[in-house]
């Protein structure tokens, strides 16, 4: 928790404080579920059972099957796994289409793929951060192997219509992989997975600890998907390495907790957002950068006299 009760933390889009009940779940798991989930003896079997329960709980919040949910170390790893895996999986072309305001964990892998000869088309958003979906679709053709777009922008809170984007991409080329970075969207807006092949989420944005995330990988892509990692058979042979069971249980606890209150929280945060917007109008030197239709959890504004890090 905040050591100075007089401070108000305003940077939850960067990271959140771990919820006390989530920390309790992790602490208990570290003491009770110490065995490797892959071990064949009784303590290992109990760990595997707990891991499966955590996977099912997180999957329920996304509306996917348990087997379509893969634990990772963070949202950045989930993005890397999906993007580099897409390039390994689809060999029929070199075309990639991506929005121009993605997280570095999307930008950097695609820069590497561009250096390897892939044709990466970047579609920039408008001045208010709104992305023109039709402009992205204009670049999708028979050679497009991947389209990537974040659901909610982490800087200004713009929400992109990834559901429509995914449906239209599949209509143009059913073999094109559609990846969505939903790190800022999870537990803030409803997520519909129709026509989406891979989707990344992160724990430390929803009051779980840093060091745990997840990747949705659709059943329809599972068999063909070539993961960029090699190693053991964990996570259905797509993400090798002994699973971080305590943090997976923490992620499940955090997701379950927030999933129950998403509608009521949305109403409360919208009221706070509106109150802050109205209050900022009293200061002519303040410029609000987030559009009116941004998610209420993110409000970006500029003020020339105060450094952003001081305000946050």
Predicted regions and their residues:
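Pyridoxal 5′-phosphate
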Residues: 1-312
